[in-house]
Regions:
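Acidic, gly/ser/pro-rich intrinsically disordered tails
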Residues: 1-2
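Negatively charged, low-complexity tracts enriched in Asp/Glu with abundant Ser/Thr
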Residues: 5-83
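C-terminal partner/receptor-binding element of secreted or periplasmic proteins
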Residues: 137-161
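A short, surface-exposed interaction/processing loop segment used at functional sites
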Residues: 113-143
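Exposed beta-strand-loop-beta-strand "reactive/processing" segments of non-cytosolic proteins
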Residues: 72-107
Length: 161
């Protein structure tokens, strides 16, 4: 009895010409993903500044000198977190760095698919992606709701998409 009689034996390999023809599209996608990572870094830095100003306003009535000094430090860029990209073999790693050069990983972004992962450790992401930066609705939500501490990366965060 032939169990494979219903299987269509089409060739599943890609020809070299097809591979070359789609290479430009793959490169464009990877460049877009890197651009979105840079935009995420910028949004995270802006959120840190906004949150620092909000925390400085908390001291307005109790210690106005501290508040004024803190606002000067924020404008001068002191005691700020800087977000940058470290690219590996498979992922872009969004890294948060302090002035004292201590680093921590904020998230990982898959270079080929654009999937955004919460960091499981300094070297590895969690298995399940939280968002996809190539999907417009998810990307816009991430840029509007990202926070420097990473609360938006938890599964029970506000996203309902």
């Amino acid at each position: 009895m032939d169990y494979t009689k219903h299987i269509n034996q089409t060739d599943m390999t890609t020809s070299f010409a097809d591979f070359v023809a789609t290479q430009d599209a793959r490169n464009d996608i990877q460049l877009k993903i890197r651009e979105y990572c840079l935009m995420l870094c910028e949004a995270l830095e802006q959120d840190f500044v906004k949150d620092s100003l909000r925390r400085a306003d908390f001291f307005l009535h109790n210690d106005p000198e501290y508040r004024a000094k803190r606002i000067e430090d924020i404008k001068a860029g002191k005691d700020m977190y800087k977000f940058s990209i470290e690219s590996g073999r498979k992922y872009h790693k969004i890294v948060m760095e302090t002035e004292s050069q201590s680093k921590s990983v904020h998230c990982f972004v898959n270079m080929k698919t654009g999937e955004l992962h919460k960091a499981a450790s300094f070297k590895a992401p969690v298995k399940e992606p939280r968002f996809n930066l190539l999907i417009i609705k998810e990307r816009e939500w991430v840029f509007e709701n990202c926070d420097w501490a990473g609360g938006y990366l938890y599964k029970n965060a506000y996203y309902t998409g």
